[in-house]
UniProtKB/Swiss-Prot annotation:
GO biological process: autophagosome assembly; autophagosome maturation; autophagy of mitochondrion; glycophagy; piecemeal microautophagy of the nucleus; protein transport
Keywords, alphabetical: Autophagy, Isopeptide bond, Membrane, Protein transport, Transport, Ubl conjugation pathway
Family: Belongs to the ATG12 family.
Compositional bias per record (Low complexity), positions renumbered to this chain: 1-18
Residue span of region Disordered: 1-47
Gene3D superfamilies per record: Phosphatidylinositol 3-kinase Catalytic Subunit, Chain A, domain 1
Topology in the lipid bilayer: Peripheral membrane protein
Matching Pfam families: APG12
Name of this chain's protein: Ubiquitin-like protein ATG12
Intracellular or extracellular location(s): Preautophagosomal structure membrane
Glycyl lysine isopeptide (Gly-Lys) (interchain with K-261 in ATG5) crosslink residues: 166
Amino acid sequence: MSSPSSRISSINNSPNPNLRKPSSRRESLDQPSNAQNAPIPDDEHGADLPLTMSASVVLTSLPRDAHQALADAEAIDTGKVTVRFQPLASAPILKNRVFKISASQKFETVVNFLRKKLNCKDTDSVICYVNSVFAPRLDEGVGGLWRCFKTDDQLIVAYSMTPAFG
């Protein structure tokens, strides 16, 4: 069991202002009557906490790796990309399978070009897969697809007239 003096000191150190009793009459006169006006004490160990995302805007400079990664991500794709078309299932075969396209173009341009080469009607469907794995969105950049999924410096686009993969 705790002694009365230790109980009083723990009450005086309590964060709850209702439990805290003034140690002297003079202290009670010096305190403001409203505890809400009291200033919040500074936190000495707050500097050890990791930065939050909202605090990261305060940084004056980025680490070199992060700066380079952001510069690479913001770079506009320039130059040409080699695209190799591979037919799947019963899709017609192109005479020439390798073409070059500007890296700044959207994947929609690749699909429209392929439809034109295959002499497709407006009602015919052409489904394109990158590396026979996934069908990219039409608004994906060709340069970004090439950077991420190239094989032997070519973007491999498999195509089919019907869905080939589940």
